[in-house]
Amino acid sequence: MKRQLNLRFNRKDIRWYLLRLFSNLQFSIILLLLIAIFSTIGTVIEQNKESSFYQTQYTLSNEYYNILNWKNIELFGFNHVYTTWWFLSLLFIFSLSLFTCSISRQIPSLQNARRWHFYKNPNQFKKFTGSQEIKTTQLNLLASCLQNYNYHIFQQGKSIYGYKGLLGRLAPIFVHGSIILLLTGSVLGLVSGFSAQEMVPSGELFRLQNIISSGKFSYIPQEFSARVNDFNIEYNPNKSISQFFSDISILNSEGKELKRSTIYVNKPLEFHGLTIYQTDWDIIAIRVRINNGNILQIPLKSVLLPNNNKIWIGVLFQEKESQLSVVLSDLQGQATIYNKNGKNILSINIGEKYIINNSTITFLNTIASTGLQIKNDPGIPIVYASFFFLITSISVSYISYSQIWIVEKNRHFYIGGVTNRAQLMFEEELLKISKMSSSI
């Protein structure tokens, strides 16, 4: 029996210890700092790359051997920080700490603030900063003055209690709730969202195949496809790129168009929780007709120049003696023909006909592909809502919660009060109330 009682007391002690720990502000701050540190690590170290990438970039022979090498990165999960069990556990414990703090501290404090407290003895006012004796004749006049300053008034005999700014005491609870909501939305996106990248030629259909990241509970929809109807680039007068556009249609399983939109950078297409972004582009081929015969599609390969400009090169004739190369630098309709020695022999316009090496060659058109990023994050609406509530509740939390007490004894009136912020403004308010009541 004694042993059972000891076990019960031990369990009770453990519960109280955990309650005090989780509701402790310092504990929450430590958790927040740990989350910030690991988030910084996740920002510095590239996430969700192939193992070969880390073996190349973070070799065992570098100067940070004891800390930052590919083995440690993969061992501790720094290559996918935000989906590791320990990071998600930190978020859960931090949320639990905020919830416990709200339940055990904030809500009781709010309930206590809503109770009416009346003082009967003027000596009780000595603990208040700015307490004073007021020269007036009626208690009702003081109550009226408090109402002019938006105080909620309660009277009991010869005592008055007033308060205002109760929302300022309520706001911290909503701040904690907003942070918990924010973390919930973030975790939901991590475990059930996904990201895909596709490079699609103009006129082609595509489905979600190249998934670059996904959560454990992600669902990759395959009940519809998409088609790139057209791709074009808008250039500045100096031939630099101003913007590139993709005309995209969403199709159901029967090929019926469900939605069509032209996307560009910062203007994505949204459909059933999916967001399709314009991210990149490429030139993959040029179509030519030789001697009015068959149409050939010449593949192009991109080459990065030392000045970071990109060109596309394709082989027009394979024979060594008559080998020619076609070079494009953009999609503005011009190209250049080079011989096997790398000499520029002809500048052409796409869509026109030329005689080259005794052959009539018509350069019909170029085929470009658009780089698309497709994302699904079901936590985004929750995150946006939580930010709205967080900003609103933080703003409201700056409202001062002020309490004022007035007592009459032997025809003398005493006033005093407390506030949780803006102490000087509160003392000035007390003086104004005193002057107003004395002048009536």
From Swiss-Prot:
Assigned GO CC terms: chloroplast thylakoid membrane
Bilayer topology term: Multi-pass membrane protein
Keyword terms: Chloroplast, Cytochrome c-type biogenesis, Membrane, Plastid, Thylakoid, Transmembrane, Transmembrane helix
Entry's transmembrane regions: 25-45, 84-104, 170-190
Single biological process term from Gene Ontology: cytochrome complex assembly
Compartment annotation: Plastid, Chloroplast thylakoid membrane
Matching Pfam families: ResB
Primary location class: plastid
Subunit and partners: May interact with CcsA.
Similarity field: Belongs to the Ccs1/CcsB family.
Functional note: Required during biogenesis of c-type cytochromes (cytochrome c6 and cytochrome f) at the step of heme attachment.
HAMAP family documented for this protein: CytC_Ccs1
Name this polypeptide is given: Cytochrome c biogenesis protein Ccs1
Record organism: Pyropia yezoensis
